[in-house]
Regions:
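Conserved polymerase palm-domain catalytic core
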Residues: 8-171, 175-190, 232, 277
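Flexible helix-coil linker/hinge segments at domain or subdomain boundaries
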Residues: 196-206
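Right-hand nucleic-acid polymerase module
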Residues: 42, 99-135, 147, 153-154, ...
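Well-ordered mid-protein domain cores that form the structural environment of catalytic cofactors
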Residues: 1-9
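Short, low-complexity, polar/charged sequence segments that are solvent-exposed and flexible
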Residues: 32-36, 195-197, 255-259
Length: 295
């Protein structure tokens, strides 16, 4: 995509983010698309079991769970002078988080200030009597979300082909690039209409994360301008920044990388010390460095 922009004399770029993507997927559309991909009129028994488990899920808040198990809240744990052991580590927990412990708190209630209460284990709230969404992070979630978006993707690809542009989507992050002679607002309206047609009633664009960028040649260099404000603003997409000349990694992406790296090293050292073993650096290299042996 960045190469395509660089080769143009100028273009428009529209990036959008879908609000609460996994939480707002329509179960009826998902089932219909799943059947369509399989080429069947109804899901097989094993497929339907997976579908039902993903559309009738429950969840809990980890802090509420720790409170029910007798642990101090997050702020208290943070403010204590001495280090607090990891509450989820069985070997050092005051209460071992066994299945029996968890079963004992399943019916636990949390009372709100208005006198209402909620159970520890919750289910997604219904909207107009209907449940939406699938859990994020399950082995099937990414695949099913792509199956769900097939018609929307096809519609957007066809639109970009007609006007000589490019469409890309990664999960809930969407970017389209097209000739600068075409109005960005016009394309935005068409994407919004396509989402309404193929995405269901609850899947919406997050207006706070919409970016409209125009790449134009200023003197001899390609420059990115925010269409809304008229000031310089590089394109940001999937952790990268492109200003018309260079593709850079976003600073927040680097910060997150180093934070995870330091956390992994610290955890490996503590684990090795606790079990009186050596630190295995190969796994750290493989996950966070170019020093790992190529697969």
């Amino acid at each position: 995509m960045f190469d395509w922009i660089a080769q143009t004399q100028g273009c428009n770029v529209l990036t959008i983010d879908l609000s609460s993507f996994f939480d707002t997927l329509d179960h009826e559309i998902l089932k219909k698309q799943w059947q369509r991909v399989n080429g069947v009129s109804s899901l097989s028994k094993d497929n339907y079991i997976v579908f039902k488990s993903l559309t009738h899920y429950s969840f809990l808040n980890i802090e509420d769970t720790l409170t029910a198990l007798g642990w101090p809240d997050r702020l208290t744990r943070k403010n204590l002078n001495k280090k607090i052991p990891n509450p989820l580590r069985k070997e050092i927990s005051a209460r071992h988080q066994s299945m029996e412990d968890f079963r004992s708190i399943r019916k636990h209630k949390f009372f709100n200030s208005d006198g209402t209460f909620k159970y520890l284990i919750q289910t997604p709230e219904k909207i107009a009597g209907k449940r939406y969404g699938i859990p994020q992070g399950s082995p099937m979630s990414a695949i099913l979300s792509n199956i769900y978006m097939l018609d929307f993707d096809q519609n957007c690809c066809d639109l970009m082909t007609q006007i000589g542009g490019i469409y890309r989507r990664y999960c809930d992050d969407i970017v389209v690039t097209f000739p600068e002679s075409i109005s960005i607002d016009e394309i935005y309206n068409k994407l919004e209409k396509a989402l309404s047609t193929h995405g269901g009633q609850q899947l919406k664009i997050n207006p706070a994360k919409v970016e409209k960028i125009q790449f134009s040649h200023v003197t001899t260099r390609l420059t990115a301008i925010d269409v809304t404000t008229g000031i310089y603003k590089p394109l940001q997409y999937l952790g990268f920044i492109y200003d018309g000349e260079k593709v850079l990694i976003r600073s927040s992406s680097l910060s997150n990388y180093y934070r995870r790296l330091v956390s992994k090293i610290r955890a490996s050292k503590n684990r090795a010390k606790r079990h009186k073993k050596i630190v295995y650096r190969r796994k750290i290299y493989r996950m966070y460095s170019h020093l790992a042996r190529k697969q």
